[in-house]
Regions:
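A structural-propensity feature for long, helix-poor, extended segments
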Residues: 143-174
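Gly/Ser/Thr-rich loops at beta-strand to alpha-helix junctions
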Residues: 111-119, 161, 188-192
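Glycine-rich phosphate/diphosphate-binding loop of Rossmann-like nucleotide-binding domains
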Residues: 113-150, 154
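A structural signal for small-residue-enriched, beta-sheet-centric alpha/beta enzyme cores
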Residues: 155-156, 185-303
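Short glycine-rich or small-residue beta-strand-to-loop segments that form or flank ligand, phosphate
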Residues: 66-70, 105-116, 154-158
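N-terminal amphipathic/basic leader segments beginning at the initiator methionine
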Residues: 1-60
Length: 303
């Protein structure tokens, strides 16, 4: 990073929209709506539907839904339950938009490095999923009390440093064999604002580029590359160190860029209680996904 150029990264379309609005950037094609629910939950929708919007935001066309709940970071049980229900509702809406089947096959992919706590959200989420594909394949849908059970399978592909393969390469092979109707990816994200760490969930129908939030770009996991729709779900667990320094000196008259040390480039900060946070959020995500895919079957097994 040069002394006169730095960039605070974010994976959240909502934060990109806020930055563009603050900078009075041309936002034609960027549509925004917001609704407030009980328990302090805020659901925001950003849609990008023009080439101008793609250039302005640096994001592909599509729909980005953000669920925010400040109490979520505190582990408030009532809030967590409400967010889980809202997540399930939003995911069902995304699934309905990309798949017109009443009974479908879904592949859930937990992206990230299980051995790095802030990045372990995806793998830990998949650990708690209600997996049904093997049972449906072996015994048929009559093995369940509800014959309308969906076929759900999960995968944790690891990271390139562990496997020597791009996640996309692994997924292409799995998708060609399993033939899911759609893929859901779970990944830890990077945020621009500290207030959104651990209490914000983003869903999008555009897929995801693993590692993009921390400047470690890999091949995109999306419809174009996989041949099936990809719904991406993520929660920010880290923030760029440059952002924290920028916020700290923003009120001064100093040139912020000159105060940025090159050593901050590539450095990210995570909350001190990230172990418990990731464990709690992974459970919340898996519960919401199970509810969305269940067709009521999961309720019988979760009691």
């Amino acid at each position: 990073m040069s002394a006169d150029k730095w960039c605070a990264r974010t994976d959240l379309a909502l934060e990109t929209q806020e930055s563009l609005k603050k900078a009075n950037t041309d936002m034609r094609g960027v549509n925004f709506s917001e609704k407030k629910l009980d328990n302090g939950i805020i659901v925001s929708v950003v849609t990008i539907d023009s080439e101008n919007a793609v250039r302005a935001t640096g994001r592909p066309k599509g729909k980005y839904v953000t669920i925010e709940a400040a109490m979520l970071s505190e582990g408030d049980e009532e809030c967590c339950q409400a967010v889980t229900r809202e997540l399930s509702k939003e995911l069902k809406s995304f699934v309905k938009a990309v798949c017109d089947k009443r009974i479908y096959a879904a592949l859930v992919v937990g992206l990230g490095n299980r051995n790095v706590t802030p990045d372990a959200l995806g793998p830990r989420c998949v650990d708690s999923l209600f997996i049904t594909r093997h049972i449906v394949k072996e015994y048929g849908r009559y093995a369940f009390s509800n014959e309308n059970v969906n076929s759900v399978c999960g995968l944790v592909p690891g990271v390139m440093a562990q496997t020597g393969m791009e996640c996309l390469e692994i997924l292409k092979g799995v998708v060609s064999e399993v033939k899911p109707d759609f893929v859901v990816t779970i990944d830890a994200l990077a945020a621009r604002s500290t207030k959104r760490l651990g209490c914000t969930i983003q869903l999008t129908d555009t897929g995801i580029v693993p590692g993009s939030g921390v400047g470690n770009h890999r091949d995109g996991i999306n419809h174009d590359n996989l041949g099936v729709p990809v719904i991406a779900i993520g929660i920010p667990t880290v923030i760029d160190a440059v952002t924290i320094v920028s916020d700290a000196v923003n009120a001064s008259r100093e040139n912020t860029a000159k105060l940025m040390s090159p050593k901050l480039n590539g450095m990210f900060v995570t909350p001190k209680d990230i172990d418990e946070t990731v464990k709690r959020l992974a459970g919340l995500l898996s519960e919401g996904i199970n509810m969305a895919f269940s067709n009521d079957e999961y309720d019988d097994y979760s009691e």
